[in-house]
Amino acid sequence: MRVPDFTHVVLVVFENHEASSIVGNPDAPTFNALGRRYARLTRYYAVAHPSLPNYLALVSGSTHGITSDCTDCIVGTRSLADTLTAAGKTWRVYAEGLPRSGFTGGSAGEYAKKHDPFLYFAAIANSRAGRDRVVPFTRLSRDLAAHRLPGFSLIVPNLCDDMHDCPVATGDTWLKEHIVPLVHSPELLGGVVFVVFDEGTSDVGGGGHVDALALGPTVRPGSSFSKTTNHYGLLRTIEDAWGLPRLGLSAKATPIGGIWKG
């Protein structure tokens, strides 16, 4: 399946809800309106429990045998950050509640390292330049205003806004306030925003059947992708868009297709 050569890719990750608790839920009007306007990936699955292995899978194609939300474990293999950098692409993590760039602690207020996967890779954790690409969420508005949105952005809401500790309605409001304006930003005219959940509450597919959306001007309005996919398929889609090497199990995954314009 052909994937567009996106100008920008933004990945937003919410927490711990099955698709059945989002799709059609009156407390999630923004999720459902966006799903109707753009594209919903109707058979999208998380790959593991708990949170951390899913985040690692999203950015490296493997859970690396990690089965906990450890905060001191380190992975020595490549991640999407490495392949992006090698291809001349820029990347950044915008983490809500992160005290400052370079912070590597396990938690701070409503920020949780377990939802910030790049800091688990040695090439980033042991590099000042790498750590400095993980920044507080407040940096996003400045980067947009300065037309400095990186090629790839991972947006990590805090433990309340991602629905981990707060109701669905809270996350939906956050999506409306922060991500809808981003979708409509001039920076995203040739880009895409993926909105997914790290895991569900069941073991279906390894980590539950979760809601997933593809948003933006490159998406065919009112479309859907109904083939079975997961975090590895999403990673494969990003890799194919930019001709990046396929990491881990993304090599065996099918890219997301049938929802793109042109």
Predicted regions and their residues:
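N-terminal pro-sequences and low-complexity stem/linker regions of secreted or lumenal proteins
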Residues: 1-262
